[in-house]
């Protein structure tokens, strides 16, 4: 099966903030695939890799198109710079939509949290909940006024169900207060940096929200406290040893070595690339594993996590 079967042509581009742009694409030679809130596509990059971007359900978007929101990051490994260099008429290849962050079925209320560019799947969730007529509250947090993308669209979608928070003033997000004010039986959704996700998860569990009602998607891998260094990965099945460079992920190193690896998000939040650790000490940077699982060092997400030891022996 082709990895990037969709051919997308850039129809329009808009600057949502100085660092965030929205892109609207037409699908060349075929119909727009069906998708639901929380879904993403993977856009192929010129270097042979790809990057996931959440699909946007923007108000008044014409039928037959797909929209993305992209943050330009100074520390980007190529994806955001490439996406910000696109112009109307350019063509890219992309995967079919995949959804690892779906809305719950049924009419239970939803409490939505978004941080920074993590608003992209949350905006689509708000649009879907509004269309269903189901109750929700959206808390959108950023560093300072002027830095939050898609505010006019969110106001059109959410009306009074939208709360805006800035770290720089008295509107700063109080997660515990937001949870206390939530409707009974709410599902909790959060997308943003790892710190925000962990804070919402911890507060929700403390409040007694069942784990199966807490849903999240990471929009930035955890930042290492010191520069990364190379290490080795040994495959248990064959004994093959692969060196992972300081600027590579384990998945990238395995692919360079000619190995076929199953993965999706490359952010440490979907669990598809999880594998067992036979020996060595992982440097966990995901948001999937519990604290207890991380301490056990028996599992790791090889899309983002690295090694504290010189070699890892993996159950691959």
Q: Residue ranges of each PLM-predicted region?
A:
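C-terminal accessory/binding modules appended to enzymatic or scaffolding proteins
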Residues: 229-262
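Ferredoxin-reductase
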Residues: 2-91, 95, 105, 142-145
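Short hydrophobic/aromatic patches at helix-to-coil boundaries
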Residues: 313-316
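Short peripheral tails and domain-boundary helices/loops at the edges of structured domains
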Residues: 61-74, 113-130, 303
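Local cysteine-cluster metal-coordination motifs and their immediate loop/turn environment
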Residues: 121, 255, 259-286, 294-309
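FNR/FR-type flavoprotein reductase catalytic core
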Residues: 80-236, 243
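A short, compositionally biased
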Residues: 36-38, 224-231, 269-271
């Amino acid at each position: 099966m082709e990895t990037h079967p969709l051919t997308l042509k850039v129809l329009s581009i808009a600057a949502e903030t100085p660092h965030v742009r929205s892109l609207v694409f037409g699908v060349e030679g075929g119909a727009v695939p069906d998708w639901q809130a929380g879904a993403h596509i993977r856009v192929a990059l010129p270097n042979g890799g790809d990057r996931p971007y959440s699909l946007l359900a923007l108000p008044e978007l014409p039928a037959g198109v797909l929209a993305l929101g992209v943050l330009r990051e100074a520390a980007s490994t190529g994806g955001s710079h490439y996406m910000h260099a696109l112009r109307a008429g350019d063509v890219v290849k992309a995967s079919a939509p995949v959804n690892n962050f779906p809305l719950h079925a049924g009419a239970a209320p939803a409490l939505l949290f978004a941080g920074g560019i993590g608003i992209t799947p949350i905006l689509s969730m708000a649009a879907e909940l509004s269309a269903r007529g189901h109750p929700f509250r959206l808390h959108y947090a950023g560093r300072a006024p002027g830095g939050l993308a898609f505010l006019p669209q969110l106001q059109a979608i959410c009306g009074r169900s939208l709360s805006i928070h800035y770290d720089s003033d008295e509107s700063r997000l109080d997660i515990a207060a937001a949870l206390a004010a939530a409707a009974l039986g709410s599902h909790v959704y959060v997308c943003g940096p790892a710190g925000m996700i962990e804070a919402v998860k911890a507060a929700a569990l403390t409040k007694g929200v069942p784990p199966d009602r807490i849903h999240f998607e990471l929009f930035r891998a955890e930042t290492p406290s010191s520069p990364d260094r190379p290490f080795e990965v040994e495959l248990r099945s064959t004994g093959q040893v692969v060196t992972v460079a300081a600027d590579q992920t384990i998945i990238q190193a395995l692919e360079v070595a000619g190995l076929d690896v199953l993965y999706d998000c490359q952010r440490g939040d979907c669990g598809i690339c999880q594998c067992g650790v036979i020996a060595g000490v992982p440097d966990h940077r995901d948001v999937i594993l519990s604290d207890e699982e991380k301490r056990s060092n028996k599992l790791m997400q090889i899309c983002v996590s690295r090694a504290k030891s010189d070699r890892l022996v993996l159950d691959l």
